[in-house]
A protein has these predicted regions:
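Disordered, acidic Ser/Thr/Pro-rich linker "stalks" and the adjacent N-terminal cap
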Residues: 72-137, 147-161, 188, 224-235
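Surface loop/turn signatures of beta-propeller and other carbohydrate-active proteins
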Residues: 1-20, 62-82, 185-187
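Beta-propeller fold recognition
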Residues: 39-89
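Hydrophobic core segments of beta-strands in well-ordered, beta-rich domains
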Residues: 22, 28-37
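Short consensus segments that form the blades of beta-propeller domains
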Residues: 11-12, 39-43, 155-160
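Trp- and acidic/polar-enriched beta-sheet ligand-binding modules for extracellular glycan
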Residues: 125-127, 153-230
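Extracellular and analogous surface-interaction loops
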Residues: 131-142, 197-202
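Extracellular beta-strand elements of beta-rich domains used
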Residues: 52, 135, 144, 168, ...
């Protein structure tokens, strides 16, 4: 029934290979493996973690929807994917985007199309290059993920300068801005940085501004904003 046992054909990043399955201290099973980008090299990969469950016949299957989406890290035994769902929606999908500049062939829409294999690129890596996403309405934002794309990067191998420095701000009107995330002094390499906010913010606009980019041009394959909107649930 579940063949292959772990399978992810779609989503922001897909594929699941070279995996291993293990059990945590609470008795939950997990499958870890590599998801593929493979634009610059066939082994351009990311490591993804998926919860494993058992159907009524006792057959195991990996639930792969949470591999590129926020999930609750359990502190007890869980029995279904719903136990790990934080009830946040992807608010930034195909929303309007404004940028400081755009390199030909790498449009801003690529940063909100849920495809890690396409990206927006600014024309430079200068301090001050920015991208703003209009969520369309004031929303309650709980988490943000920034996936950098390294357009025209020339660094080879592991060096100490491969970190990203930036600021994220939020606004309800696009005029008055508040600091949401300050990574202007960051020295940790995190090309797929995920930030869960200490407390949610209410905003319509989210802006990321470059401070330092290690090589190439300031570029983003996914500026992903997670949260809720004040709307009734579908009937």
């Amino acid at each position: 029934r579940h063949n292959p046992f772990s399978y992810k054909p779609e989503g922001f990043v897909n594929g699941i290979g070279h995996g291993s399955t293990f059990q945590d201290i609470h008795g939950n099973y997990w499958n870890i493996g590599t998801s593929t980008i493979s634009k610059r090299h066939m082994f351009e990969r990311r490591v993804s973690l998926y919860p494993v469950f058992f159907d009524k016949d006792g057959d195991a299957y990996a639930y792969t929807a949470w591999g590129d989406y926020p999930m609750i890290v359990p502190d007890k035994k869980v029995s279904s994917p719903q136990d790990l769902f934080p009830e946040w929606m992807l608010l930034s999908y195909k929303k309007e985007v404004e940028t400081s500049s755009t390199l030909e062939g790498y449009p801003a829409a690529n940063a909100v199309n849920e495809d890690i294999r396409t990206w927006w690129s600014a024309k430079t890596a200068d301090k001050g290059e920015f991208m703003t996403v209009d969520l369309g309405q004031n929303s309650k934002i709980y988490a943000i993920q920034i996936n950098f794309a390294d357009q025209d990067a020339m660094i080879s191998g592991k060096v100490d300068s491969t970190f990203y420095q930036y600021r994220i701000e939020d606004s309800q009107d696009g005029i008055t801005w508040n600091m949401t995330v300050d990574k202007s002094e960051n020295k940790v390499e995190a090309p797929n940085d995920y930030i869960q906010l200490d407390k949610p913010v209410n905003a319509r606009y989210v802006r990321i501004t470059n401070i330092y980019f290690p090589s190439g041009k300031f570029s983003i394959s996914g500026l992903r904003v997670f949260g809720k909107v004040d709307k009734p649930l579908p009937a």
